[in-house]
Amino acid sequence: MTSATSPIILKWDPKSLEIRTLTVERLLEPLVTQVTTLVNTSNKGPSGKKKGRSKKAHVLAASVEQATQNFLEKGEQIAKESQDLKEELVAAVEDVRKQGETMRIASSEFADDPCSSVKRGTMVRAARALLSAVTRLLILADMADVMRLLSHLKIVEEALEAVKNATNEQDLANRFKEFGKEMVKLNYVAARRQQELKDPHCRDEMAAARGALKKNATMLYTASQAFLRHPDVAATRANRDYVFKQVQEAIAGISNAAQATSPTDEAKGHTGIGELAAALNEFDNKIILDPMTFSEARFRPSLEERLESIISGAALMADSSCTRDDRRERIVAECNAVRQALQDLLSEYMNNTGRKEKGDPLNIAIDKMTKKTRDLRRQLRKAVMDHISDSFLETNVPLLVLIEAAKSGNEKEVKEYAQVFREHANKLVEVANLACSISNNEEGVKLVRMAATQIDSLCPQVINAALTLAARPQSKVAQDNMDVFKDQWEKQVRVLTEAVDDITSVDDFLSVSENHILEDVNKCVIALQEGDVDTLDRTAGAIRGRAARVIHIINAEMENYEAGVYTEKVLEATKLLSETVMPRFAEQVEVAIEALSANVPQPFEENEFIDASRLVYDGVRDIRKAVLMIRTPEELEDDSDFEQEDYDVRSRTSVQTEDDQLIAGQSARAIMAQLPQEEKAKIAEQVEIFHQEKSKLDAEVAKWDDSGNDIIVLAKQMCMIMMEMTDFTRGKGPLKNTSDVINAAKKIAEAGSRMDKLARAVADQCPDSACKQDLLAYLQRIALYCHQLNICSKVKAEVQNLGGELIVSGTGVQSTFTTFYEVDCDVIDGGRASQLSTHLPTCAEGAPIGSGSSDSSMLDSATSLIQAAKNLMNAVVLTVKASYVASTKYQKVYGTAAVNSPVVSWKMKAPEKKPLVKREKPEEFQTRVRRGSQKKHISPVQALSEFKAMDSF
């Protein structure tokens, strides 16, 4: 960087013809086009037509001459105004004039005889020389603009030096005012230059430098003022020197970006996707080999070495302090699975050596290998999200504690809290780098690394500001300095948080947040029962923080979509959590803490607290379900934790006791997933028939706008619930227990009842008796099939717990469908009885599932449920159609009066809305190859280089 007294040095070779700005390119393009057209006039060789003068060539030659004259006039004006490059500009203008005259003569002779290859060659050489001369003139003019910018930078540097040398606060105020004025001028000139730069990297560097200059300007004044007021406090000098260095680096950044000499991202270590992600991508590419050329001695060591390198990186992440034990075990298991898959793949390659085509076993092994690496990626992403969820929670607390200690003037305490704050900052940086390591989003990774670097450099200065305040707690200047550094820290943490959120998946975030909130809810309940106030308060605070972060991120995510049914459902779920659930939870926490903190413990209703905690978990889970509504089956498969993680939240308590786990056993959904393949195949056949009926309903409701049409809304709701019920029979979906299936059946019955009322109102107003009778008949079917579905989902059971031994007997069996029936049982724990609502697996015969229930009984139950759902789906389709037909009859008879007060509004649905911004999954940020347009646009620079490359004639 230039000092305040050194002359301006341009880091740009004046002889270089590299075009660096869009303006030069735009100005050069018309001349290049005209010259190219002129040269190509007779490019096709001699013509069979009568020879003569080419009028078109003469016109083109005249246009080239006029364009050259325009460049000469502008160049002379720039040369007169320039102070630094006057001689070079004058020489360039004369060169353009000379080459322009040569071009005029050559083009005129060529126009008179366009078939002469000699004259054409002479004109091509003249055109090449003219273009080079004009390009050099424009580049020199561009250099003159850069010199003006550098002059502004020099003035700002001098003003900065003056601020640094201020001797008192009044002198500082005056000098800083002048510095501010020069800053405004520099920012204007730099912004113009930024818009003109061709290189995106240089534009980014210029924007970053301008932002840094603006960001540090406020800190510059307060840090300098604190140093002048308290020169005896060493921390004030450290603050001031840091800010001055930041401003100087920003000025140097503007200078380098303006001259296109900025250090590359590679030099700064900010470029590229994450190391672990890149290694996995490369490994996935390397496993695709040609059996004809496969050699075990060549490929086995290479692939095994690559895989072990990946596993080493995964092991480091697994061993990190914030990685949960269960996540660590899953990572280890996936690493072992990947190792085994590679050995299987290599064995298949050996079996296929020398073959032209890959056999089916080899293709299966490749698919398995790819799936295992994908599974490993998922576990690594979840591990990173564990870290993010914990570390980016209540990020301002360590800072606030540090500031409070500083305000009290307790320097010893400040040093202790400074260590905590430093560890917190280091953790943020570490976690941010972990997030980068597994991300494929190159631009996002760059932003995260830059933000993390800023956090790393700012942390010591925040501590210095706190030390200054601790040494002079009564000083307003020290307080102002602390406030400025506090604001800057909070802004930088927000930048880092948003950058990290951009390179991580919302689905992963919701999955991990849901699990963490469940952990915290369990901790809260245990702390409540043990009377541990501190743990209760701290954990409840973590729950509030996690919920607030879920709400913030999901609201921000929905801004990427146009308003519609999807966004309404998601925002409705977030609103319920923020406005209803969380206030109730906070109230119950306050009541519990007050009761436990009293000198004489006050009685309070534990179940109220437990229910409030349960609602928080349910609220987050509902948000996640709403967000996943538009995901594809492939995306949902990738989010397998939604299906596999078997977290149960009991209706009365979330505490998992040994008795609880003994009673719960496996979920009914898990048991359905363990059926024999023959039974699964039969269920799949029934599900396929059900899907055919579903497609009919989808086609019918897709026609209509559901705003103002509750019949369509109810049909969609019933369809969604029936899909969940059929998924349950395959061991999938959100319904875990058959108590969930019972509740789903109740919801369908309620929706069917509401649809019955609406459709009957339509039927009552229908003047056509035939249509009316059809509609009423279909409504009877809905009532019948709703009742049938309800029966298929229930079985009554009586459960007794005698001497710790479960005895289950079926009574009043209405169906053979297996169920988890909720009962309340007293669990005696230390003389204290607590009500636990427990899910008990039972079958029609009354025996516990897994200890005697027959697979055939479960198959019959599943097929009965699917059949009932299919029949109900068909009835809903017919009801929707009949309701529309009845409404049209009503309108035909009564005319426009009917439109004023319809029971439901039948309007065709508008075209489906798409996201304004496609949020790609991080792993999809790979290079895509697309077929280009057949029509090519040749840039002026390319055309110029082609002229340079042409041989002389």
Swiss-Prot record:
Which residue intervals are annotated with compositional bias (Basic residues) in the record?
928-938
Single GO cellular component term: actin cytoskeleton
Q: List the keywords (alphabetical).
A: Cell adhesion, Cell junction, Cell membrane, Cell projection, Cytoplasm, Cytoskeleton, Developmental protein, Differentiation, Disease variant, Lissencephaly, Membrane, Nucleus, Phosphoprotein
Instruction: List Phosphothreonine occurrences by residue.
Output: 632
Q: Provide the protein's localization.
A: Cell membrane; Cytoplasm; Cytoplasm, Cytoskeleton; Cell junction, Adherens junction
Q: Which Pfam families match?
A: Vinculin
GO MF annotations for this entry? actin filament binding; beta-catenin binding; cadherin binding; identical protein binding; structural constituent of cytoskeleton
Question: Which superkingdom does the taxonomy of this entry point to?
Answer: Eukaryota
Tell me a GO biological process for this protein. regulation of neuron migration
Q: Where is the major localization of this protein?
A: membrane
Phosphoserine (modified residue): where? 640, 651, 901, 939
Query: What membrane topology was assigned to this protein in its record?
Result: Peripheral membrane protein
Q: Which InterPro entries match?
A: Alpha-catenin/vinculin-like_sf, Alpha_catenin, Vinculin/catenin, Vinculin_CS
Keyword Phosphoprotein listed? The answer is yes
Q: Where is the composition biased (Basic and acidic residues)?
A: 912-927
The segments labelled Disordered in the record are 912-939
| Tissues with expression | Expressed in neural tissues, with strongest expression in fetal and adult brain. Expressed in the developing cortical plate and marginal zone of 20-week-old human fetal brain.
Task: Please state which protein family the record places this protein in.
Answer: Belongs to the vinculin/alpha-catenin family.
Q: Which disorder is it associated with?
A: Cortical dysplasia, complex, with other brain malformations 9: An autosomal recessive disorder characterized by neurodevelopmental delay apparent from early infancy, acquired microcephaly, hypotonic cerebral palsy, inability to ambulate or speak, and intractable seizures. Brain imaging shows pachygyria with severe cortical gray matter thickening, paucity of gyri without an obvious posterior-anterior gradient or focal dysplasias, hypogenesis of the corpus callosum, and cerebellar hypoplasia.
Functional summary from the UniProt entry: May function as a linker between cadherin adhesion receptors and the cytoskeleton to regulate cell-cell adhesion and differentiation in the nervous system. Required for proper regulation of cortical neuronal migration and neurite growth. It acts as a negative regulator of Arp2/3 complex activity and Arp2/3-mediated actin polymerization. It thereby suppresses excessive actin branching which would impair neurite growth and stability. Regulates morphological plasticity of synapses and cerebellar and hippocampal lamination during development. Functions in the control of startle modulation.
Subunit relationships: Interacts with CDH1 and CDH2. Interacts with ZNF639; recruits CTNNA2 to the nucleus. Interacts with F-actin.
Q: What PANTHER family does the record point to? A: ALPHA CATENIN (PTHR18914), CATENIN ALPHA-2 (PTHR18914:SF23)
Question: What is the protein's name according to its record?
Answer: Catenin alpha-2
What species was this sequence derived from? Homo sapiens (Human)
**Name of the encoding gene:** CTNNA2
